[in-house]
Design a protein with these regions (language model features):
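Walker A/P-loop NTP-binding motif of AAA+ ATPase domains
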Residues: 218, 222-354
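AAA+ P-loop ATPase mechanoenzymes
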Residues: 2-240, 253
Length: 354
């Protein structure tokens, strides 16, 4: 590397420019050719960048209010999002989950430096019920038992419509109780949601839309008595035996396929079984299945809210299946799940096919 404008003089022959300031340029050889860098401009740009950086992190209005409430200088943060209607249901369960030991002492929404009321929405639940949830806003929670146990919960919606919950607890403060572990709070919330939340025992589809059980569906079916008795025994009666089978370490899962031409009432029979089931029922239409991962997710969800009747409509057309393709990977995934090769404790898959 050589400074531009410097002559090739001998060391004992001083240059006329010897007393001038050194050139601020230096050149760099690259495969694309030579280019020059003005070190003065580079230094000025670097200084300007440093000048723009804050010398210290300043607390905004929210931080100041939060730290004052928590009586802490630092917080431990946990955050998670859930897609679409699942996120709204998770927020609905949050109130139920916290109610035994915590109460809201203040809630607000800050927009452009101004405190405003939180934004709420009302969502449908099973049984034509509805529940109000906080969509956007912040809540300050305080223990009903130990008042110094406090935390902040922020409810928000991401740009793509996913619902998010963010938790702040005082760093280094042990607030764990027999019910709540604040170092693992959101995982515990999810676990309780699937165990005792609004999906448990409900009838819904893969997009978490609730389906009402029709009490008059018996009047809409013309039954073959033997088919009715077999289905009642293999599905409805079996449901009641599932807890005991699990207790004894025996298989409490089985699969059923309803086959017949279109219009013979297969879907109606599946809904009849759901109407008479006391367990969670999930209805999955063929267009909701596009790949093996979708199948796995269906069974993962069914296991989480088990015992579950998992109804899969038109299994032969799911994921653009050809019913003649016996070695199709999607069909193989279904069959493995149904015959117990993949453990699905507490899940009864019921598939319909043409």
């Amino acid at each position: 590397m050589k400074e531009k404008g410097t002559p090739n003089n001998q060391e004992n022959e001083p240059s006329p420019e010897a007393n001038e300031a050194p050139s601020p340029f230096f050149s760099v050889q690259t495969p694309m050719g030579e280019f020059s860098v003005d070190m003065k401009e580079f230094a000025d740009a670097k200084a300007a960048a440093y000048a723009m950086m804050p010398k210290q992190k300043r607390s905004n209005l929210f931080d100041s209010k939060m730290f004052t409430f928590l009586e802490a200088a630092k917080t431990q943060r946990d955050s998670r999002y859930w897609r679409g209607h699942l996120g709204a249901l998770m927020k609905a369960h949050l109130d139920v989950y916290l109610e035994p030991e915590f109460e809201v002492v203040e809630e607000f929404l800050i927009e452009e430096g101004v405190f405003r009321p939180c934004l709420y929405d009302t969502i449908p639940l099973q049984g034509n019920k509805r529940q109000r949830i906080m969509v956007l806003g912040t809540r300050f929670y305080q223990s009903k038992i130990t008042p110094e146990h406090r935390f902040t919960l922020i409810s928000s919606v991401d740009g793509d419509g996913d619902h998010r919950v963010t938790l702040h607890v005082p760093a280094g403060r042990n607030m764990n109780t027999e019910r709540y572990d604040f170092s693992n709070f959101i995982n515990q919330l999810e676990e309780d949601f699937y165990k005792a939340g609004p999906l448990n025992g409900a009838f819904f589809d893969l997009k978490y839309n609730f389906i009402e059980r029709d009490p008059n569906i018996d009047n809409l079916l013309a039954w073959d008595s033997k088919v009715k008795e077999t289905l009642w025994s293999d599905i409805i009666t079996f449901q009641k035996a599932m807890p005991k089978l699990k207790e004894l370490g025996l298989s409490n899962s089985r699969g059923v396929i309803l086959a017949g031409p279109p219009g013979t009432g297969k879907t109606m029979i599946a809904k009849w079984l759901a109407a008479h089931s006391d367990i969670t029922c999930i209805l999955i239409s063929a267009e909701m299945i596009t790949g093996r991962q979708d199948i796995k997710k269906c069974y993962e969800l069914a296991r989480k809210v088990s015992p579950t009747l998992l109804i899969i409509e038109d299994i032969d057309t799911a994921g653009a299946l050809d019913r003649r393709a016996a070695d199709h990977p999607l069909l193989g995934e279904f069959l493995q799940s149904m015959d117990g090769i993949v453990p699905n404790h507490g899940v009864i898959p019921l598939a319909t096919t043409n």
